[in-house]
Amino acid sequence: MSEIYRFGVSLDKSLIEAFDRHIQSRHYHNRSEALRDLIREELVRKKWTEGGTVAGAVIMTYDHHKRELVNRLLDIQHDFQKTIIASSHVHLDHDHCLEVIAVKGNAADVEQLSLKLKSLVGVKHLSLSISSAE
């Protein structure tokens, strides 16, 4: 584990009160935990916008009865085989499936995969969750 550094932060009263409410609503034990998470989120966002390496999950639901949808989903996934590291498929009911695709790679590639899958007719919902790969 790395060394822990302490530093002071000056905030106006209304901002610290809002931050404390945020901490309480998220069940953090202290301000340091919440601040660490906010910094990490911002660093991941920076990697995303600058095209760094990210890891995450594409989560989508779709109607597998839509004509040619499954074939198109598979074609796109094969086009991104360097980005996709695993996938899991779940049958929600007779008509609908849930697919979770684990990804790792350049942020732009991950975004392109997500956008291509989301644009297909029959994909009901798609969300992308990213984190730092480092």
Swiss-Prot record:
Residues bound to Ni(2+): 78, 89, 91, 97
Disulfide bonds listed in the record: none
Record-given protein name: Putative nickel-responsive regulator
Top-level taxon of origin: Bacteria
Cofactors demanded by this protein: Ni(2+)
The family this protein is said to belong to: Belongs to the transcriptional regulatory CopG/NikR family.
The entry's keywords: DNA-binding, Metal-binding, Nickel, Transcription, Transcription regulation
Transmembrane residue ranges: none
HAMAP family, sorted: NikR
